Amino acid sequence: MADVLSQNEIDALLKQLSTGELDADDFTETKSVKVKEYDFSRPAKFSKEHLRTLEIIFEHYGRLLSSNLPAYLRKNVQVEVMNSEAVTYSEFSNALSNPVLLGVVNMAPLSGNIIIEIATNLGYAIIDRLLGGVGEPLEKKREFSEIELSILEKIFTILIDLLREPWTNVVEIHPYLERIETNPQFAQIISPTEMIAIVTVNINIGGVEGLMNICLPYLTLEDVMDKLNTKYWFSTMQDRDETSYADVIETAILSLIHISEPTRH
């Protein structure tokens, strides 16, 4: 505890100030300690490094979409990762329109689900294209029919299968579609206050543009959060590349040995 001045000491200081022996400017304030506010409703569970690694994963995913989807849609597909951010699940769900197009994805062996949201205009364009049309979106929003959802389920299955490869450097996943929801109220996969990471991807299908949002709850990724850093991601990628290269060399050597062996009659 700081020392407390006696009355005599206070009187002496006042006298020195009044006579000019002391200058008030000589007394400087102690620098205030900077305090960083912490919002308990938005705990910082995703660092910038986590978000950057997720962007790298989905940049890889975007390249797979660009090269695989044209085979089904017979249209040029361009995919670009726009950004990533950490928000609460309620912020994500409250921003959803109705109807919406949500794929609830099981990320086995990780516990919990993720959500893939596809812009409805892209959904309508995909349906039109798969039914023989030119791939134009509807001018006015409406509910998806059961037949249309059945068609979109096949596309979601393709999208989800393509998730496997980009995640290999972090964890080997076996994702599958649990269900499609068109009402955001029925897609409450976690508590509204839980933190999630959202990766936003822009998709252009033959001139029709829309966003795809991937909602990744912290609770789903919790077991692999320590692996969501660029250093780990690139090191495992290099290890896998070296292993693949070694496998190719081994196969080539075995083939040469087999060829060089004399044929026995």
Regions found by a protein language model. Give the residues of each.
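N-terminal auxiliary interaction/assembly segments of multi-subunit proteins
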Residues: M1-S260, R264
